[in-house]
Amino acid sequence: MPPRILIVDDSSLVRHLLRQCFESEPGWQVSGEACNGEEGIEKAQEVHPNFIVLDLSMPVMNGLDAAKILSKLMPAVPVVMFTSFTTSNLESEALAAGIRRVIMKSGPLAELVGCVRALVKDAA
């Protein structure tokens, strides 16, 4: 099944860039966007994505807190954190929150696309 992706990031520029990147892949669809974790949870319940990409540092609710809730509401939906911030504990905190992988924004977008492709294939 092709990915239906929810993008959760407080930067409209990042959301736009990710939408263009994902929708350039054959069959991929961005089913929704949100600008903070709280809105991301609401949007996920509305659009039922089969993949979620979210930022760490956002207003209202950060990505880790949102991921904890999303992993309980939608345990089969892979969540990947796409962030420019890192801490020494981020990987372990992310795994504990239900996040499958942390990808740095400073890396190539191909890494994120490959991750989406692999996790959606594994979930099928």
Label the predicted regions.
Residues G27-C35, K43:
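Short hydrophobic/Thr-rich beta-strand motif most characteristic of the beta2 strand and flanking loop
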Residues N36-E39, N62-A66:
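Acidic catalytic/metal-coordinating carboxylates
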Residues D65, T86-I103, G107, E111-G114:
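Alpha4 helix (beta4-alpha4-beta5 surface) of REC/receiver domains from two-component response regulators
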Residues V47-V53:
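Active-site beta3 strand of CheY-like receiver
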Residues Q45-V47, I69-A76, A97:
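Conserved phosphotransfer cores of two-component systems
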Residues M58:
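Receiver (REC) domain active-site loop signature in two-component systems and cognate sites
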Residues P2-V14, L18-F22:
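Conserved acidic segment of CheY-like receiver
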